[in-house]
Amino acid sequence: YNIKKISDKNEIDNIYSNFIKLSSQKNVFCSKEILNFFFNDLDLYTICKNDKIKSFVYLFKDKNNFAISEPFIYSGIVNHPKLNMKNSRYNNEVFKINELIIDEIFSTYKNININLPPNFFDARPFLWFNYGEDNKKKFLVTPCYTSIIDIQSREPIDVFNDIDDVKRRD
């Protein structure tokens, strides 16, 4: 994966059209209009694999260059759409990308405060950052929502078939 900091405002339309608008995590706060309007107050990053955007990071900065959540209700990370990937493969890739974002981008900020959207399901990369390390920076994760996966309406064989082949063998 490679990380690119967006410094040209003209890139926003392309990123929005080819990535953000396709993601289930899109919201009004990462619309091209908002990104263009607040461009000078934002740090924007793309995380790509083989020239294909896998995640987009948008952080609003205050006058002290701290990443803050206000005035946005949601901010932080927009992950790529699942498309035809199996759930387990998609979740694993998103987990790895989010770990990379935390290690390579978020850890460079002295102070960071973001509000991830309700369909950002896996907080483990935040919880595990510097886990067990005394006197090192950590994230304070405060969920403002819960999530339930309802598999009652599905046949057990369908749930089993959605599991990645490698995980099924385990």
What are these regions (language model features)?
Residues Y1-S7, W128-D170:
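Acyltransferase donor/substrate-recognition loop-hinge adjacent to the catalytic core
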Residues I12-K52:
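An N-terminal domain-cap segment
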Residues L35-L100:
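Conserved donor-binding loop and adjoining core beta-sheet/short helix segment
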Residues L42, Y74, Y109-N111, C144-T146:
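Extracellular structured ligand-interaction cores
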Residues D51, P118, I151-S153:
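Short, flexible loop/turn elements at secondary-structure junctions
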Residues I68-P71, S88, A123-W128, V159-F160:
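Short, conserved acidic/polar surface loops in the N-terminal third of protein domains
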Residues L83-M85, N119-D122, R154:
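A short acidic, glycine/proline-enriched capping/turn motif at secondary-structure boundaries
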Residues E93-P143:
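Non-catalytic accessory segments adjacent to catalytic cores
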